[in-house]
């Protein structure tokens, strides 16, 4: 049953294939073998996910890990977005996180439902950023950037990101994005990280490069 649904989904995704898009998009993800990219444009995949998510087969598909294709992982992420129960979401999310193998799938996840559970989710983030999996760490930092930089901001969150130590490019790139975004949203609180050189040189320089002053 599990194998059958995977084959069925793959067939349907190939029906949405755009080879020119595949060739272009694959170049943006050097960690992914081009043969693992089908080439489905995001709007088409979201439309498919919206309909597929209404079926019982969607639950079966989410049990089939690891997935073979990049788009299957993105579909999985889009299905997570449709889960309305927070506790169920966390269970399914933590099954999926270890299998994320690229920045695009990682950053696709926004999980708006966590906005109603920010205190509890913060405990999960603390665990994610201490992971030995680079994309789990990146995901944790991205959640701090997406959900904890406005009214919910506390300087301790920025300290957590600053304390992350990694040699992984895609972890450090997200750290830089975090501080660039934080400068735009919480300038007075974040500028000391730059002025006092609290970040490693690479992250400091990249964050400054990415930062666009709100003025």
Write out the residue ranges for each language-model feature.
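Alpha-solenoid helical repeat architecture
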Residues: 65-66, 97-98, 129-130, 164-165, ...
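Short inter-helical turns and helix N-cap capping residues of alpha-solenoid HEAT/ARM repeat scaffolds
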Residues: 68-69, 102, 132-133, 167-169, ...
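Conserved small/polar residues in nucleotide/adenosyl-binding loops
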Residues: 211-215
